[in-house]
Amino acid sequence: MTISPPEREEKKARVIVDKDPVPTSFEKWAQPGHFDRTLARGPKTTTWIWNLHALAHDFDTHTSDLEDISRKIFAAHFGHLAVVTIWLSGMIFHGAKFSNYEAWLSDPLNVRPSAQVVWPIVGQDILNGDVGGGFHGIQITSGLFQVWRGWGITNSFQLYCTAIGGLVLAGLFLFAGWFHYHKRAPKLEWFQNVESMLNHHLQVLLGCGSLGWAGHLIHVSAPINKLLDAGVAVKDIPLPHEFILNKSVLIDLFPGFAAGLTPFFTLNWGQYADFLTFKGGLNPVTGGLWLTDISHHHLAIAVLFIIAGHQYRTNWGIGHSIKEILENHKGPFTGEGHKGLYENLTTSWHAQLATNLAFLGSLTIIIAHHMYAMPPYPYLATDYATQLCIFTHHIWIGGFLIVGGAAHAAIFMVRDYDPVVNQNNVLDRVIRHRDAIISHLNWVCIFLGFHSFGLYIHNDTMRALGRPQDMFSDTAIQLQPVFAQWVQNLHTLAPGGTAPNALEPVSYAFGGGVLAVGGKVAMMPIALGTADFLIHHIHAFTIHVTVLILLKGVLFARSSRLIPDKANLGFRFPCDGPGRGGTCQVSGWDHVFLGLFWMYNSLSIVIFHFSWKMQSDVWGTVDAAGNVSHITGGNFAQSAITINGWLRDFLWAQASQVINSYGSALSAYGLMFLGAHFVWAFSLMFLFSGRGYWQELIESIVWAHNKLKVAPAIQPRALSITQGRAVGVAHYLLGGIATTWAFFHAHILSVG
């Protein structure tokens, strides 16, 4: 940390705005394509509508003024937040008006969540299944009921209030977006003032946000949940504001409140140990993390972030300067080190977005794993359908975010990279030895692919020939995941040394006992064996191939031996011009396109592994004697070691519910299963067909229209190569994801 004279840093944190920079014009916005001179002239061919969609949010093409681009992004963020709050408000409104939330709250073990009732127009009210408690509707698996229970919501009136609050918030966000673009727009130096931004985000948004949430958990959620856990009827529980206004209600539940704030200021924090706990494990009544543990966590996080938000130098010559930190960061083998990265990240929002998407995507996948290993909400752990769905959801969202990170990194390389700024720094050095990186990564992919797949081929062959003793399995030639087992063991034992007062381990997934809630397994140790070792190496293979494609796209986005002037061709182009064969599918965009298929491939195997493993080895019922009966009876260890086993005992066996769903409340999933297969197959028409074929067909159809004197004013054009691929990959992913959605739902709602 350095202290600098104040005069040098004086300008740093002064907020500077332009007044009324852009007029508010509904006439202009009403004109399609107003942001682009060519598009604004209107459509001549059908390509116009595609370009309109491609460029509407590509602010780089609207203007080259970085300040205006920054303002547009800033305003768009407020618009995005408004859309999110409207969407949340709609979900909460459904919970208030159409759901069985109050019935579920009174008996969460026997009533299943539903927030949608289908109207009987053409007999489709068959979809309203009996979810218990006399309610008929579509079962939902978004986990919202569990979240609301955790918040401390006890009736639909509170949900109505929250839904209205969401709309009010959306209105504020929309106003803020308009105000900060049209009335008081920040100057470029405000957007580039990273120290103030870090202080604000860390301290105000994360720090005070966590502190406020800890306050809600301590004063509202924990007491209400404690009463609910004790079996107090919902109508007898005080309303949220009563806990805050009437201290005696809180003191009855948590005596630590009687001491007031004195222990806080005298550092005698042990007085608060009844509502800021460190129990570990899960609440045996609900199967969720202890809310008092979560309160403690959020309070600690708030303290850390508020301290972190004081670290960076603004107008008081004290604290860190990001530019100085980066420029001093040099190792013995990294040349100029991080010099130039500050300029990259403050002048290229694509570079900034790329790193943020990669981090956020990775974090989302980590969250997917925490949701089952340490279920944060009450009664989430025993709602198997919801567990499966939120795992799948977070895995896929994480995958899309990571691919998006690679996409924007490639756009940065093409549009924003400045070779003068990046001379012999880490980025320049990585680009200069990209051949070594990519060829080694390629070798790793080949090695992993042949060896991991080879183990399965061996097992299928041995099983086909009736030689089980020669297979890789827990009962023949063992390939135990010894490192993973060591890590599990370490995590089970470690809290004994690091947190001696904790009552239970961090997660039962690593070790400990079986936690049953209402006769169902909430969590238990997940034993790993040969089957997990095999599928883990398939995960390693598919993830490395995805990384190979995406990283190659970024490192070769500007140039390659094949096309040295690639940067001049832009981020997306079909081929290097006519007359140069073998140069198609080399643009940055094409690498993202290919990367999406491998991301989907990769993550499908992840969710299949999770779904089968949990049904086989974790989820199930527990009898009075403590014996566990798993949903698929522990068949993972012996069936998942052959490809035939995956096809027969997972895909085929578990598809029976969706295939046989007609005539039942699950029949919509049967229709969806077929429809999504159709959407997937439809994508192949775009992916396996050339542009010329369609252009010829279109011209013959246009001839027929001319003959009938119904010629279109806008000339029809075949999709460009890139547009065709975009439509293809979109339908491929949509079809694949919706097929999986129907397959998972129909099965787990039946058996879970």
Curated annotation (Swiss-Prot):
Taxonomic path: Bacteria, Bacillati, Cyanobacteriota, Cyanophyceae, Nostocales
UniProt cofactor note: PSI electron transfer chain: 5 chlorophyll a, 1 chlorophyll a', 2 phylloquinones and 3 4Fe-4S clusters. PSI core antenna: 90 chlorophyll a, 22 carotenoids, 3 phospholipids and 1 galactolipid. P700 is a chlorophyll a/chlorophyll a' dimer, A0 is one or more chlorophyll a, A1 is one or both phylloquinones and FX is a shared 4Fe-4S iron-sulfur center.
Entry's transmembrane regions: 73-96, 159-182, 198-222, 294-312, 349-372, 388-414, 436-458, 533-551, 591-612, 666-688, 726-746
Keywords linked to the UniProt accession: 4Fe-4S, Chlorophyll, Chromophore, Electron transport, Iron, Iron-sulfur, Magnesium, Membrane, Metal-binding, Oxidoreductase, Photosynthesis, Photosystem I, Thylakoid, Transmembrane, Transmembrane helix, Transport
Quaternary structure (record): The PsaA/B heterodimer binds the P700 chlorophyll special pair and subsequent electron acceptors. PSI consists of a core antenna complex that captures photons, and an electron transfer chain that converts photonic excitation into a charge separation. The cyanobacterial PSI reaction center is composed of one copy each of PsaA,B,C,D,E,F,I,J,K,L,M and X, and forms trimeric complexes.
Chain residues that bind chlorophyll a': H677
Enzyme superclass (EC): oxidoreductase
One of the record's GO cellular component terms: photosystem I
Name recorded for this polypeptide: Photosystem I P700 chlorophyll a apoprotein A1
